[in-house]
Amino acid sequence: MTEKTKEKHVLIFSAQWCGPCRQMKSSVLSDSKVKQRLSEYDSVQYLDIDEANGRQLSAAYRVSAVPTVIIVNEEGRHKKMGHFMNTYNFLEFLK
């Protein structure tokens, strides 16, 4: 992808107590290829399900496990992955 993806947003749900979330943050979300791919989206929100905003959005999107990553398009449709993903799987999910 060389141009910004039109009207797509990424929501990344996690929690401080979640081991796989911490692992994903330190190994996957810090990867330069992942950062580049995420920069192609209109927005990326990191949401803690134990905080008010994260709790509200996790209920709205029916998040039942963390980490969960959701991509929302301009029509409000979304795709969701609710488990730890390595760098390769995360990049594939973002396509």
Please name every model-derived segment.
Residues 59-64:
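A short glycine-leucine-enriched loop at secondary-structure breakpoints
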Residues 22-37:
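Typically the conserved alpha-helix immediately C-terminal to a functionally engaged Cys/Sec
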Residues 18-22, 69:
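The canonical Cys-X-X-Cys-His
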Residues 13, 34-54:
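Thiol-based oxidoreductase modules, predominantly thioredoxin-like and allied folds used
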Residues 65-95:
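Non-catalytic, surface beta->alpha helical segment in thiol-disulfide oxidoreductase systems
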Residues 4-17:
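Short active-site neighborhood of thiol/selenol oxidoreductases, capturing the structured segment around
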